[in-house]
C-alpha cells in the first residue's frame, strides 16, 4: 500500500497534484502537522527507491548560493533556470533588451560635441532636483506651446510654461489631495487662482526672502549657479494673469487623462496595495524587514542628535547670512569710494579750469578710527544691575514678611519674636565674619588655579553657548589691566612717601658730572652711554639741593656742592638734566619739535649750528589721534581730573606705546600666535579653547551665585515657618493654661 512521503513539509501541494517546491529563501526544515485541508501526493512502490535520493539532491541544490537576491529568485525565467531538471538545457535564457541595433535618428536628435573640461564635472542630484520647476515638457506640451504663442512678440517660454504647470500641480495637491477618487470633480480656475498666487514654486520665493533679509531692494538675487535663461523668467503673478486661464484648460485635459494622478513624470514604485512581483516597470519594491526594537534611551539620543544638528544648521544659516551682509556692505563701501574718487577727479579738473588754489584736504581720504567693542563693559553692567535687583527683591521680601508677622502677633509676642530675630541676625553676622577669610582664601586659590591651568578640556555637556572673543582683545585687556595695576601701585607708593623720602630708584635724576675726555678722542664722536663713559676719568661729581625749585622752573640759578660741602662755581651748565616719571606733567608738550638744528663744518674746521623753526601744519598727523585743545583746557581748569580720564596721561601712554610697544617679538611671530604654537594647535582652535575656558568659568560662577541665593531664600523661608510654628505652640500653651485655671 502506498504511503505518503515523510517530508510533506517541503512545500505547499497545489491543486493539480504537484508541489511548488521548497522555498528558495528557506534552508531550514521544520516538521508540521498534517492538515485535513491539504492535498497530499501518493507515491507508488516503484517511486520509493528514488525518493530519498531525489530529496537529498533537492536539498543540496537549494543550499547552493545562486548570487541572486532571494526575492528575485521567484521571477519566472530565473525560477526555470534554477530548477534541477533544467540545468542541462541550452535554450533557456533571461530576456534582455536588444542593444545591438543602431538608432538612425540619433544624430538628428542629439547634436553638438562634448569637450572634456579641465576639471572634474561637479553636480549634486539631490540639490538639482530641488531647484527649478518639477515639471518637464514632452512632445505634446511642445506642440501646444507653439500653438499657444502663435507668433506673438512676448511669447511664453518653455521655462515659464513648466513653472505654470508645476504651480497647477502644487495647488491641486494642496486643495484636492484625493482627486484620484473622483477625477471629474476638478476645481475651477477661479478657485485655484488664490492658492497659485501664494505658492512658492522653485526657488523664486526663497530668492525673494533672501533678498529681503539682505536688504537688496529691487535688485535681483543672482547666484553663481543661475543660468541666463532663469534671469529672463517673468514674475508668477504676471504669468498667471496673462496665460493662467488658457494653460488651465490644457492642464485639466491632461489631468483627466491620467485619472486625477500626477502628470509630472516620475519613477514607478511599488505601493502598499500592489503585490505584483512580475511587473518589470517597478523600480523599487518593498521589503518586509523586521524592525529592530529600540529603547527609549536610543530615541532620546537620536532626538538630541537631531536637535543639535538642527541648531548647528541654524547657526550655519545665520553665519552665511551675516557673511553675505558683510560682503554686501564692503561692496557698497567700494562703490561709494569709487564714486568719491570720480567726484574728486572732477573737482580737480574744475579747480584747474577756474584757477582755484587752496587746501586739498577734501581730495585725500582720512584715516578711520578703529571701533572698540563694548561687550565686556556691557556684561559687567548687566551683572551689576542683576545683583542689585536681586538684593532689592530680597529686602522687599524681608519687609513684607516682617509686616505679616507684625499683623499676626500681639504686642508681647511681637517683642519676644523681634528679640529672637535680632539674636539670629547677630549669630548669622558672626558666622559670616568668621567664614569670610576662608571664602577669600578659596577664591584666591581658585584664581591661582585658573591662572596656572588655563587650558582645561571640558565635556560637551558643560560647554555653554557663548560668543567667543578674539585673543587680541583678551590680551589687550590683560595688558591694560596690568598697566593700570602698576600705575595705581606707583601712585599709592608716592602718596605714602610724601615729602619724607626722596626715592632715587623710582624718581632718578641724572647726576652732574664733569668728564675729562682724552685728547685723542673727539668730543663730538664720544659715546654717551654709561658703560663706555666709565672708561673716562671723572674729575668731580656734585649734588644739588632744592631740586624741585629747579625742576618746576622757579629759579634759574643752580648751585653745585662738592663732597666737602663747598660751593663749586662753574659756567658749564645753567640747569641740570633730570628725568622724573611723576613730574612729566610739568613739562611742555608740543605736537612736534619746536626747532630743528643742523651741525656743519666751515672753513678752517669751524663748526656752525644752524637753527630752523618748524612751521605749523594744520593737517598734523597727531591731530587725528589726540585733541590738543582738549588737553590744554583740561590742564588749565581747576577741577580735579580722574587719572583714567586725563587726556594728558593718555598722551603719555600713547607716546610710550608708540616708542616701546611692538606687535612682534624678536623672531617675527605675533604674540597672539605664541600660545597656539606652544600647544601645537591652530590659532582658531586656540581661540575656541580660550573662549570656552572663559565662558565655563563665568557660567560656574553664575551657577554658584544662583545656588547661594536659592539657599539663602530657602533658609529665610524655613526661619519664617519655624517662627510661625513656635508662635502657634505658644498660643496653644497659653490657651491650655487659661482653660486649666478656669
Curated annotation (Swiss-Prot):
Stored Pfam families: EPL1
Highest taxon, organism lineage: Eukaryota
Any one GO molecular function term: histone acetyltransferase activity
Signal sequence bounds: none
Keyword tags: Cell cycle, DNA damage, DNA repair, Nucleus, Transcription, Transcription regulation
Subcellular location field: Nucleus
Region feature Disordered, mapped onto this chain: 1-28, 416-446, 718-742
Residue ranges, compositional bias (Low complexity): 724-734
InterPro entries recorded: Enhancer_polycomb, Enhancer_polycomb-like_N
Any single GO CC term annotated in Swiss-Prot or TrEMBL for this entry: nucleosome
GO biological process, one term: DNA repair
Stretches with biased composition (Polar residues): 1-27
Principal subcellular localisation of the protein: nucleus
Function summary: Component of the NuA4 histone acetyltransferase complex which is involved in transcriptional activation of selected genes principally by acetylation of nucleosomal histone H4 and H2A. The NuA4 complex is also involved in DNA repair. Involved in gene silencing by neighboring heterochromatin, blockage of the silencing spreading along the chromosome, and required for cell cycle progression through G2/M.
Subunit structure, interactors included: Component of the NuA4 histone acetyltransferase complex.
PANTHER family in the cross-refs: ENHANCER OF POLYCOMB
Family membership: Belongs to the enhancer of polycomb family.
Annotated protein name in UniProt: Enhancer of polycomb-like protein 1
Lineage: Eukaryota, Fungi, Dikarya, Ascomycota, Saccharomycotina
